[in-house]
Amino acid sequence: MMSSMQREAARYDLIRDFYLDVVGMEVGREPTAAALLDLLGDVRGMRVLDVACGHGRIARELARRGARVAGVDISEVLLDRARATEIGDPLGITYLNVDATSSRALAGETFDGVACNHGLADIDDLDGAVATVARVLRPDGRFVFSILHPCFPGWDEDAPSSWPRGEGYYAEGWWLARNPGIRGKVGSNHRTLSTYLNTLVRHHLTIDEVAEPAPTPRMRARQLAAQPDAGPPPVFFVVRCRRV
């Protein structure tokens, strides 16, 4: 029987080429990436950890902005791509195959900031991941993460959605979207907003700013076409908190 870590890694190992084609390397292609980087603020000289770093898109942007970056992921396949990019265009990034939910993860390490762009939805053990973040973050250090907005379903079956249409907001757990996108291939963990917030509180992380980035113009047009009589709800949710 596969462990939780092996299951999570296999989801992305099996779709590497598809994932790389869809996501690419440009941070400007995704609304949440810009918001996440803005909330992290000036990272020059900071030591920053990128959790669920994948092929290194956010890690490389952080390094370009002057951070000393370590990226962790459980998919060795995606890390191989990140390392290959680093060899071809060195930015001083260290990539590690680490289970961020383990109580032994990154033992003895300390970071000024931690970023996680959409990765929490892929991690089955939310509490374990946040516990690790709180443990490695220095006092007053920043943790910024982005997720699909947990409060609203997608406007149709093909839309990004934190939870399956028809199942209900309170039905937490892993689910597989019925569309050809990434979440239709690797699935996603849905949690209520209170689950996210209470997990932060439990690990002494205090929220000091949130953002709900506007969707891309293409997404907005699709929202309006599907829901012409209602104001389209937000799609994304980005949170910054600090260790106290």
Model-based region annotation:
Residues 105-114:
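A short acidic, Gly/Pro-enriched loop at the edge of an enzyme's catalytic core
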Residues 49-51, 55-103:
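Class I SAM-dependent methyltransferase SAM/SAH-binding core
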Residues 113-126:
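A short SAM/SAH-binding and catalytic strip from SAM-dependent methyltransferases
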Residues 2-44, 57, 61, 78-81, 142-176, ...:
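Conserved class I S-adenosyl-L-methionine
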Residues 147, 151, 181-195:
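Acceptor-substrate binding/catalytic loop of class I
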